[in-house]
Regions:
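Alpha-helical transmembrane segments
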Residues: 13-16
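C-terminal motif of bacterial Sec signal peptides marking the signal peptidase cleavage site
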Residues: 18-21
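Compact beta-sheet-dominated domain cores in extracellular/mature segments
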Residues: 23-146
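Bacterial N-terminal signal peptides that target proteins for export
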Residues: 1-11
Length: 146
């Protein structure tokens, strides 16, 4: 019975993030992955992680481990920590797949992730650093395939 309540809690938390406009932070990675994907800050499933069980149109809206500092025209700086351009590896739940996109709103270069994990996005061709998909994802769609 515990497995069912964990799955329900994860789905409920993802729904709140998507539909309630409360997209502060994604749920942490579950010990047993049964839905969606888990994105990791570093290669080989290291660093901070987050469970993604529903589509996210803009990873910049989700608080995460990567910090971006911006300056306005008056020289004022601000920083924002998010998951935008931050994923370096992905674990996929059995029966699920995902597409990670270079730009928000599911646009730009796309990296399809099947039922096999990606241990290092530096080994996946893409438009970002050194022509790879490392630290490149800005939106993600997840799909149940069975």
């Amino acid at each position: 019975m515990r497995r069912r309540s964990t799955r329900t809690a994860t789905i409920f938390a993802s729904a709140l993030l998507l539909f309630d406009g409360c997209r502060d932070k994604l749920p942490v990675a579950p010990s047993e992955l049964t839905t969606g994907i888990v994105i990791y800050q570093h290669a080989n499933f290291l660093g901070e992680s987050a469970h993604v069980a529903a589509d996210i149109s803009n990873l910049d809206d989700v608080r995460g481990p990567c910090v971006r500092t911006e300056s306005d025209s008056e020289g004022n700086t601000s920083s924002k920590d998010s998951w935008d351009d931050c994923a370096s590896s992905v674990r996929v739940a059995p029966g699920w797949r995902a597409t990670l996109y270079e730009d928000p709103n599911y646009k730009g270069w796309a990296a399809d992730v099947g039922e096999e994990n990606v241990t290092n996005f530096q080994l996946v061709r893409g438009p970002c650093s050194r022509d790879t998909f490392n630290d490149c994802a800005s939106s993600v769609r997840v799909f149940r395939v069975r």
